[in-house]
A protein has these predicted regions:
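Acidic/polar, low-complexity intrinsically disordered N-terminal segments immediately downstream
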Residues: 4-5, 21-100, 105, 249-298
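Sec-dependent N-terminal signal peptides
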Residues: 5-13
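Auxiliary, metal-adjacent structural segments of Zn-dependent hydrolase domains
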Residues: 26, 82-139
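Second-shell loop/turn segments in exported
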Residues: 70-78, 147-159, 208-216, 245
Length: 298
């Protein structure tokens, strides 16, 4: 009896539904509404300082489509993202403006910067600070840790700024390939993913590498040479060459010579001038002479 009554109810309901569908007029307006994001003062500042002069999108809200789901991550903090956007513009984008010209920056600097809250950790005791994708995007991790590193140029470079120069070098290399002779300088001693093991973690200078990560492969090596060179003073570099010894320093110098020639010949960028400009601007960040929170629009 209960089953019968249930069937009657379903039949009646179905009939009612069919009847109502045939009589109702469907609206042409979609019921799926895109999420409306309220414009913040930061968004307006980004429009004037990133989008309008450079056509660069600085994404600070969590974007599921842009996030690598192989790693745990969280959204960037609003105030930390404001500071990071100021730092990137002042120390990186405007440094290239000054040395290479604003048209260079407009044409080649990636059109998307995506900032997330946490660094990405691998199971080999390493972490990802940033990545470059397709010559168009730089992914910046660890935004919410920024305040911990603002008091030190070394920390700021290690966790943020060196990464940007490293990834930008990848983008330049994707646009105009570097001399393949570079990969042969230490071609037999690259370690692939073993660069992070105890074998790769020490003695890399004497083997002709400026960092442990340089040992991964040629394209990472050349990006490390450029990014390390322009974010450290000459005294630091000279000390590393002394530590590398005659053989290691000779190999690193050969790599630096190719980088210097590549940047000047292909991009008309003097890497010594670029280094001076970057370091000057980084010092201004550390000594507080540049506001990292000002969202006023001129």
């Amino acid at each position: 009896m209960k089953k019968y009554l249930l069937n009657i109810f379903l039949f009646a309901a179905t009939g009612l539904t069919i009847s109502s569908c045939t009589e109702a007029k469907l609206s042409s307006e979609s019921v799926i509404k895109p999420e409306e994001k309220k414009q913040t003062p930061f968004d307006k500042w980004l429009q004037v300082n990133y989008v309008e002069p450079y056509n660069i999108e600085f994404i600070w809200r969590y974007d599921d489509k842009e996030t690598d789901h192989n790693y745990y991550n969280i959204p960037a903090d609003y105030n930390a993202a404001i500071k990071l956007a100021h730092i990137v513009k002042y120390t990186c984008i405007e440094a290239y403006d000054r040395v290479a010209g604003i048209n260079f920056t407009r044409q080649y600097f990636p059109k998307m910067l995506y900032a997330t809250g946490e660094f990405e950790y691998n199971n080999n005791n390493t972490m990802i600070l940033g990545t470059a994708e397709g010559g168009k995007k730089i992914y910046l991790a660890g935004t919410n840790n920024l305040d911990k590193f603002l008091g030190s140029i070394d920390d700021l470079n290690t966790f943020y700024l060196k990464t940007i120069h490293h990834e930008f070098m990848h983008i330049l290399n994707q646009t105009k390939p570097y001399d393949t002779a570079y990969d042969l300088i230490t071609g037999t001693t690259y370690l692939s993913d073993d660069w992070s093991t105890s074998t790769g973690a020490s003695g890399y200078l004497k083997r002709g590498y400026i960092s442990a990560y340089s040992q991964k492969e040629g394209r990472e090596d050349i990006a490390e040479i450029l990014s390390t060179y322009v974010t450290n003073p000459k005294s630091w570099w000279d000390a590393k060459m002394t530590e590398a010894g005659t053989e290691g320093a000779t190999l690193i110098q050969k790599k630096l010579d190719i980088v210097r020639s590549y940047m000047k010949t292909e991009w008309n960028v003097d890497i010594d001038e670029l280094r001076d400009e970057i370091l000057r601007r980084e010092n201004n960040i550390i000594n507080g002479s540049v506001s990292l929170t000002d969202l006023s629009i001129n």
